[in-house]
Each structure stands twice: as C-alpha cells, then as structure tokens.
C-alpha cells in the first residue's frame, strides 16, 4: 500500500522580479514550474534579472543522461523540445512546426523549424537539424554514458532495446564482467556476443548497428521515429530529456565530458548557459536566437550557491540581494505579522504535474500470471481476512472519509490550503480541449 498522501507545498518570499519569472514559466523541470509570486519588497532584480540561491550541487548538467529535477534545469531552460505544453496543458509546437502519424508503419514524422545552436557567449554555432536528434538518441543509447532515463527510449523506439542490450553485453565481454549469479560474457572475432548463465543454454547476440534503431534524419528539417507499437503517449515522451537534441559534433568531441561546463554546452532554448562554476554560481541568459524570444521577459537568471540557503535566504530577501527564498514554518508567523515583510510572502503555485494516491493490495494470495507472479502475503497478515476487507466497498470508503485533506495540507500550507486539494488521480491540467 502506498502511503504518500499530500502534495509538497511551500511558502515563498519573493522580490519583484519573481513575477516575471512566473509569467514566463522559466524555472521549469519535467515540464513544470516552481516559483513564488511577488509583491512589494525591495529586490536585486531590475525587472530583467532573477537571482536565487541553491544549496544542492548537481552531479551533472548533462540533460541527456540525468533523471533528477535539479540536474534537468539546463535541459528544461536551454534546450527546446520538438513539442511542448502551454500553461493550460495543451500541446503546442516546439522545434517541430507540424507532425504526422502513419499507423501502418508505426512512424511519426516531424517537420522542424529554423533554429540555431548558440555557445556560452550567445554566439551562433550552427543550425539545429534533424541529425542532432539522431545523434542525441545514439548518445543516450550508449552504455558508456550510463543514461539513467534510457528506458524511456528502449521501451518505445523500434530496435533501441536490441541495440542497447547488445552494446551492454559487448562492454561486459570486453571488460571481463561476471555477474553475481555467475553469468559470463564472451565475444568472437565477428562481434557475436555469447551470454552464458548458470543452468541455462548459452544465448548469442549478433552485432546490432545504430541504423537498426527507429530514428532517422530524412533531411535537415525532417525527422522520423518508428515505434515498437502504437503507443498513444509518445508525443508526451518527447518533452522528456532523452528526446532533446544535442549538437552532434560537440557530442563527438566531448564524449562523457558533454555538458560539464558552460563551454561544453550548446543551447537552442529560451536561455543559454552563460556560466557555471561548481559550488559558486550558475548563470543562464536570454537566448536572442530562440524562435520564441519575444515571449521571454527575463534577461538573466543567476543561481548562487549557499550551503545554508534555507537559513540565509530570508535575510537576503530583506536586503534585496536575491529574489526568492523559502520561508520556513518557524519564522512564517513573524513574517506575516511584520508590516515590512507580510506582503513579501505568498503561496507557491500548485504543482499539477503529478499526484499521490493510495493503492490497495487486491492480491494477498500467491498467484502465477502468464508473464509475472505474485508472492502473496505472509500468514501473519491473515491474507483471507485481508481479501474480505479489501473487497468490501465500505471498508475502502472508510479510508476516503477518514482522511481530512484540509488538516493534512494545513501543516505545510496554513494559508490557502484549499488551493492545493485534489480529489482525483488525474491532475486538473492533465488534458484540455481547444477551449
């Protein structure tokens, strides 16, 4: 049974520049934003800059391999996706201006707009082409780079799973890996890998070239993906980092050092990475080359490292040194009762990118399905009585009516908690019609 129940909410203290950040939707991760509203306080921002603290150092800026929110910042703000969602959850054009689906061949075709890559100085390097998506996907599928999100590709793109697995086995053979269960890997002169597991017949894997993977640059502005099956959520997947483009020559030049600094990162999004110094600062500047630059209203986003951001942030807000900080419950009352700070405090925007919910265990007994098995519950948990209870509608309703959402949310959101209530699994902005 899952026990998560409430959504994380925070109280933010913000200076004037935060309003622009909210309107522009800049601080994004996983297609979402997190920013406080602004009113009344002195701020370091001039209306064109936005400064915040960070206290957790990202392990990488490589958007093609990471899977954590903090490390997605560069990919979310500095690299555009083929399609994107607007603030109402409606899918819009991104780097692709149109797309078509061929059900007979399970192929999506995307037509790209004119766009450019820029370096850390904002200078144009080269145009964005369909080949950049192909090269980026090959990078994700290269085991040496250990992409944490490779499963978002291998599960859906034709040939990707075979390509990735073969190269994992090949690496194992070349490095003499022996699995914990005794499985060994060998490779012959023709590149055929043999995997030998205990008590099993050896399995052989012929070489798989990347040409077998279902991604193709038809020309500079036409890109196709061929799927393993008709997956209705594929367009949504394109908003995730492993489907973002990367400049091929830069990937080839930098290898595992790609996106480890501003100099090894090229951008084609709303911002470009202008500077990055580990444990010091992180600066993104507006990209004037971006097709949607007219709708980006902040020129510079600066992140300053401060190991005690949660402690120092509120005081730095008062001094006008930064534009946003988290206000803890230990000082919230004093801020709200002080005429000089009360108007600086506002609730964070509700995050409707995900939900938490209870899921009951309806299978307390062991059972063998065609493709998986359930071990069942230990006798001490009385599986027979469990089954009787869990299949009783009134028993399940007791959980529904026994949870007081308001009381739970009020712990972290003492003011305005009603805005964060959610009584459905599907977030309200999950989908929308033309209206």
Q: What is each model feature region?
A:
Residues 1-9, 13-28:
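N-terminal secretory signal peptides
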Residues 2-9, 31, 87, 113-145, ...:
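Extracytoplasmic/periplasmic ligand-capture domains
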Residues 30-41:
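Bacterial lipoprotein signal-peptidase II cleavage site
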Residues 47-56, 107-110, 269, 282, ...:
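Short, well-ordered beta-strand elements
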Residues 53-103, 266:
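N-terminal lobe/hinge region of extracytoplasmic solute-binding protein
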Residues 146-212, 365-391, 435:
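Surface-exposed intrinsically disordered loops and tails
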Residues 180-212, 220-221, 226-302, 310:
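Gly/Pro-rich hinge or "lid" segments in bacterial periplasmic/extracellular proteins
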Residues 417-435:
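Structural transition elements
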């Amino acid at each position: 049974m899952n026990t998560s129940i409430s959504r994380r909410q925070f109280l933010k203290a913000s200076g004037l520049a935060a309003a622009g950040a909210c309107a522009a939707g800049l601080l994004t991760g996983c297609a979402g934003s997190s920013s406080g509203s602004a009113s009344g306080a002195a701020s370091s921002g001039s209306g064109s800059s936005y400064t915040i603290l960070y206290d957790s150092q990202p392990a990488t800026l490589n958007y093609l391999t990471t899977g954590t929110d903090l490390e997605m910042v560069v990919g979310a703000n500095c690299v555009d996706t083929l399609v994107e969602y607007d603030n109402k959850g409606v899918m819009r054009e991104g780097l692709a201006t149109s797309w078509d689906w061929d059900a007979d061949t399970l192929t999506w075709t995307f037509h790209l707009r004119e766009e450019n890559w820029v370096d850390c100085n904002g200078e144009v390097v080269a145009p964005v082409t369909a080949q950049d998506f192909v090269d980026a996907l090959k990078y994700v599928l290269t085991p040496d780079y250990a992409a944490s999100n490779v499963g978002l590709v291998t599960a859906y793109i034709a040939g990707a799973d075979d390509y990735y697995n073969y190269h994992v086995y090949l690496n194992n053979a070349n490095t003499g890996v022996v699995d914990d269960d005794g499985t060994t890997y060998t490779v012959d002169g023709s590149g055929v890998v043999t995997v030998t597991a205990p008590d099993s017949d050896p399995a052989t894997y012929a070489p798989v070239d990347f040409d077998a993977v279902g991604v193709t640059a038809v020309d500079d502005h036409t890109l196709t993906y061929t799927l393993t099956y008709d997956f209705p959520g594929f367009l949504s997947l394109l908003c995730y980092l492993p489907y973002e483009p990367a400049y091929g020559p830069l990937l080839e030049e930098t290898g595992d050092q790609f996106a480890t600094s501003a100099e090894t990162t090229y951008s084609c999004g709303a911002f470009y990475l202008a500077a990055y110094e580990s444990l010091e600062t992180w600066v993104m500047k507006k990209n004037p080359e971006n097709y949607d630059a007219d709708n980006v209203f902040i020129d510079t986003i600066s992140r300053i490292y401060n190991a005690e951001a949660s402690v120092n942030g509120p005081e730095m807000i008062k001094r006008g040194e930064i534009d946003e900080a988290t206000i803890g419950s230990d000082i919230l009352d004093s801020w709200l009762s002080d005429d000089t700070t009360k108007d600086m405090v506002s609730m964070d925007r509700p995050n409707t990118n995900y939900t938490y919910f209870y899921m009951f265990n309806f299978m307390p007994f062991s059972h063998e399905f065609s493709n998986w098995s359930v071990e069942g519950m230990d006798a001490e948990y009385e599986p027979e009585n469990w089954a009787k209870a869990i299949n009783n509608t009134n028993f399940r309703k007791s959980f529904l009516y026994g949870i007081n959402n308001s009381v739970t949310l009020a712990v972290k959101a003492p003011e305005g908690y009603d805005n964060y209530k959610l009584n459905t699994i599907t977030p309200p902005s999950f989908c929308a019609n033309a209206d």
